[in-house]
């Protein structure tokens, strides 16, 4: 739902929405017309049957392993790590495809806004072996080892020298990856408020399963936010 909101109101708008604070000049509430439009379009997806009938109880990784992998679902909303996670479950001859989360009419961001590199290798500031830790990180993310990772873990290469080593399974990702103009935080910042995240998750599931309409979703979130 974070990406969906961000297409309408941008990442700063999403952060403002869930925290109730202004972000980089953006101030958005649950009464905002674009927030309502986002909720209405999400509810429309549910009404048209775009979501799994099991979505109300779908817990990771059930959707990708039990519905997408056997071919019962045509699309799964996920990241470039999916081919690696699902490689033992999908058919050997599966032809992987990919497209960015779509643009929306009159949206703040289009489909060139993406979340990239949301996992990191870090060194503790108090480490007494920081130099050696950095050498290990270099070893893992460059040269032959990096190329080996693309083969065994089906991941995007981190070393520019391996820019031609993208796995076949991720061939469809590269064009959109290279075209990225705006970089999102994880989930476009929708989890910026720990107090509201569980309620948002619960009501998003209800919205996607048709248990709430857009107005009911907005009402529930306003109550949770104290608006």
Give the role of each language-model region:
Residues 1-27, 73:
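Extracytoplasmic/periplasmic solute-binding protein
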Residues 7-12, 48, 126-133, 206:
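Short helix-loop capping/hinge motifs at secondary-structure junctions, enriched
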Residues 23-55:
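Glycine-centered hinge/linker elements that transmit conformational signals in sensory
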Residues 54-69:
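Short helix-initiation/N-cap motifs at beta->coil->alpha
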Residues 69-78, 94:
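Alpha-to-beta junction loops
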Residues 78-83, 119:
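Beta->alpha turn/N-cap motifs
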Residues 88-153:
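Extracytoplasmic/periplasmic substrate-recognition and gating elements
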Residues 115, 151-163, 171-227:
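C-terminal capping/gating helix-and-loop segments adjacent to ligand/active sites or protein-protein/ligand interfaces
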């Amino acid at each position: 739902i974070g990406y969906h909101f961000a297409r309408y109101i941008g990442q700063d708008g999403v952060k403002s929405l869930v925290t109730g604070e202004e972000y980089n000049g953006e101030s958005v509430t649950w009464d905002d017309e674009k927030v309502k439009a986002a909720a209405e379009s999400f509810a429309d997806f549910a009404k048209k049957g775009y979501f799994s009938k099991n979505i109300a109880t779908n817990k990771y990784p059930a959707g990708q392993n039990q519905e997408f992998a056997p071919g019962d679902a045509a699309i799964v909303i996920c990241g470039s790590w999916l081919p690696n996670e699902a490689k033992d479950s999908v058919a050997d001859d599966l032809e992987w495809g990919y497209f960015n989360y779509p643009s929306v009419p009159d949206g703040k961001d289009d489909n060139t806004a993406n979340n990239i590199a949301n996992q990191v290798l870090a060194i503790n500031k108090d480490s007494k072996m920081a130099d050696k830790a950095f050498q290990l990180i270099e070893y893992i993310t460059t040269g032959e080892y990096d190329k080996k990772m693309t083969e065994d873990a089906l991941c995007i290469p981190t070393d520019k020298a391996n820019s031609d080593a993208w796995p076949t399974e991720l061939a469809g990702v590269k064009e959109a990856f290279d075209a990225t103009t705006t970089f999102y935080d994880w989930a476009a910042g929708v989890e910026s408020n720990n107090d509201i995240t569980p309620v948002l998750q619960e009501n998003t599931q209800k919205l996607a399963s048709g248990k709430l309409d857009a107005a009911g979703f907005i009402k529930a979130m306003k109550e949770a936010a104290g608006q």
